[in-house]
């Protein structure tokens, strides 16, 4: 079965079995909602077990979750550093123009017909996502995911068309 990373357990939260998760999910509210089925992978990326979310809340930059049958700090401390993943079957359907992060990572980024680089990471600093574009011989380009910049995302052809606003690329 194919799995996709949605978060990393970075610490415990309190004594009642809550976990502090650093989310890398494109749909965190949906992914961590009560009843969601996820898979737990250890620090060597080996499958450990299926888990079910019983509660979720946001706190600062973290998602605080509690898993079924894990109700005390002693039961969850060993999972620090583990990864939560969603199976391909549990991803859900997307609306027109929506896509998953794993579909964007690795896409070629073009301005007109000039290859700029490849999306290597997606950051979530605030109001909009920022795509980190790996370029050859240059520093990474931070590309805001906003309509004036990202013109088209062609998932089947793994291509992103952009128009770089003045000042966005400080190496040109």
Curated annotation (Swiss-Prot):
The keyword Isomerase does not apply. InterPro entries: PRC-brl_dom, PRC_barrel-like_sf, RimM, RimM_N, RimM_N_sf, Transl_B-barrel_sf. Gene3D superfamilies: PRC-barrel domain, RimM. It comes from the Bacteria. Keywords: Chaperone, Cytoplasm, Ribosome biogenesis, rRNA processing. The keyword Plastid does not apply. One of its GO terms (biological process) is rRNA processing. It is found in: Cytoplasm. SUPFAM superfamilies: PRC-barrel domain, Translation proteins. Belongs to the RimM family. This is Ribosome maturation factor RimM. It comes from Streptococcus pyogenes serotype M3 (strain ATCC BAA-595 / MGAS315).
């Amino acid at each position: 079965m194919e799995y996709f990373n949605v978060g990393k357990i970075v610490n415990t939260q309190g004594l009642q079995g809550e976990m502090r998760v650093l989310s890398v999910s494109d749909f965190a509210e949906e992914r961590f909602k009560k009843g969601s089925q996820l898979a737990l992978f250890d620090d060597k990326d080996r499958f450990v077990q299926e888990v079910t979310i019983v509660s979720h809340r946001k706190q600062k930059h973290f998602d605080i979750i509690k898993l079924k049958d894990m109700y005390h700090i002693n039961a969850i401390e060993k999972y620090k550093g583990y990864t939560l993943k969603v199976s391909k079957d549990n991803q859900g359907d997307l609306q027109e123009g929506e896509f998953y992060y794993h579909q964007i990572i690795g896409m070629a980024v073009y301005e007109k017909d000039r290859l700029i680089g490849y999306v290597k990471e997606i950051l979530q600093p605030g109001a909009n996502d920022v795509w980190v574009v790996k370029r050859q011989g240059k520093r990474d380009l931070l590309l805001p995911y906003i309509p004036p910049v990202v013109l088209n995302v062609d998932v089947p052809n793994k291509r992103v068309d952009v128009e770089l606003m003045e000042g966005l690329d400080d190496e040109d």
